[in-house]
From Swiss-Prot:
<keyword id="KW-0028">Amino-acid biosynthesis</keyword>
<dbReference type="Pfam" id="PF08502">
    <property type="entry name" value="LeuA_dimer"/>
</dbReference>
<feature type="region of interest" description="Regulatory domain">
    <location>
        <begin position="392"/>
        <end position="519"/>
    </location>
</feature>
<protein>
    <recommendedName>
        <fullName>2-isopropylmalate synthase</fullName>
        <ecNumber>2.3.3.13</ecNumber>
    </recommendedName>
</protein>
<dbReference type="GO" id="GO:0003852">
    <property type="term" value="F:2-isopropylmalate synthase activity"/>
</dbReference>
<keyword id="KW-0432">Leucine biosynthesis</keyword>
<dbReference type="InterPro" id="IPR005671">
    <property type="entry name" value="LeuA_bact_synth"/>
</dbReference>
<dbReference type="Pfam" id="PF00682">
    <property type="entry name" value="HMGL-like"/>
</dbReference>
<feature type="binding site">
    <location>
        <position position="204"/>
    </location>
    <ligand>
        <name>Mn(2+)</name>
    </ligand>
</feature>
<keyword id="KW-0479">Metal-binding</keyword>
<feature type="binding site">
    <location>
        <position position="14"/>
    </location>
    <ligand>
        <name>Mn(2+)</name>
    </ligand>
</feature>
<comment type="subunit">
    <text>Homodimer.</text>
</comment>
<dbReference type="InterPro" id="IPR054691">
    <property type="entry name" value="LeuA/HCS_post-cat"/>
</dbReference>
<comment type="pathway">
    <text>Amino-acid biosynthesis; L-leucine biosynthesis; L-leucine from 3-methyl-2-oxobutanoate: step 1/4.</text>
</comment>
<dbReference type="GO" id="GO:0005829">
    <property type="term" value="C:cytosol"/>
</dbReference>
<keyword id="KW-0464">Manganese</keyword>
<feature type="domain" description="Pyruvate carboxyltransferase">
    <location>
        <begin position="5"/>
        <end position="267"/>
    </location>
</feature>
Amino acid sequence: MKSKVVIFDTTLRDGEQALQASLSVKEKLQIALSLEKCGIDILEIGFPVSSPGDFKSVQTISKNIKNSRICSLARCIEKDIDAAGEAMSSSDSFRIHIFLATSTLHMESKLKKNFNEIIDMAVFSVKKALRYTDDIEFSCEDATRTTMDNLCRIVETLIKSGVKTINIPDTVGYTVPNELSCIIKNLFERVPNIHKSIISVHCHDDLGMAVGNSISAIQAGARQIEGTINGIGERAGNTALEEIIMAIKVREDILSVSTNINYKEIYRTSKIVSQICNMPIPSNKAIVGSNAFAHSSGIHQDGVLKNRKNYEIMEPSSIGLKEVKLNLTSRSGRAAVKHYMDEMGYNNSDYNIDELYTAFLKLADKKGQVFDYDLEALAFINKQQDEWEYFSLKFFSVQSISNSLSTASVKLLCGKKTYTESSTTSNGPVDAIYQALNRIACFPIILQKFQLVAKGKGKDALGQVDILVEHKKRKFHGVGLATDIIEASAQAMINVLNNIWKAKQVNKKLKILKDFKKK
């Protein structure tokens, strides 16, 4: 039977330290509930003594979390431990996490204490915390730069004092996998009562090795891993929990351990943390990045279409990702283009794959990424993108008439002759201009995604707006780029409207062809 690895999440404590602004109590609770649904064992939800707001958030979360065990941080100071115990008092079971530096550097330059004093402080604090709960975790801060003799000595003493979990933090992300493995193995060999406690590791990513170090610790005997969702945290961040969790699952053949995680909640939880914390996920981020299951190379796409296991070591659905598509770019091959046409229900006899692929490559070189509706237009209208811009924005103005209301006026070229003007009042300038544009186009759409990315710095910086809308159960993309955010937003919507119009022209032509065949 595989042994369990306890997953300890510190997104709401260590992770929040990386944010430019503190989260509200409501936002923290939303993240905590998502983590609980994901099956996280331990939730470190704050540092209660640090501020009244943090104390309140720990109190609130303690009342609402039922399945995960909650935990809060405290220094080896009485008021810290009291604050932690009182803030979590409404919970049936909780953990107090105490920490104290043990490295010579920290003892001498930061704490101004010798090692005997450090041990006395640690033991006193553990006794104080045991008045509130029997679940105590102790972190030897900067453990990976602590001498092995001192580390073994304090760990043995702490376990005798009643500590159930001993955490070995790589506080500054200094260690490497083999070194951390040796530290853990040394503890198991030299500390006689080590098996009375769970050994944990808390790795930072300053050298980009947090996940690798955590894996090596598991192989050496550690049975609790601490980290954060998306790896957010102080400086370069922490161990990314979604990565360590999936590494345990995918490589259970060599790690021989398991977790209690609900894997299908990983992607959703990652997105919630990203959105609430306002920290975008890099596209190349392992497990949850937008490119994690994307394939652009023609060779890879062909291999995936034949068998996904050729280029995917896990199924996207295993983390709760429902829809995964091949990216159509200039690197895509015929197999990917044909796959998209098949997915849309077209037969080989409906179009010429050679002609379509040639036209596709020209468009991909010009546009970058090509979508399904682009392929339809190439196959059945056979014109390049710049030839089918039905809508063109000639003029727009937006005025704010109050704190929340804006009015927009637009002049839109529809086809080659018709100019139309429209104005509307709505909540915010972008919404106002979108309503004005769509009042002219008359396409029923639902905005599903609006993303703004800055390109460059200073007054000459460009704003790129990416939007995704749904029209009659089909998704359409649009991109706008301008120094003015409102203009970029308008361009993105014009892009969408042209894509919808283009799809409608395809449908009209296909209907004519279908009626002709019937005759």
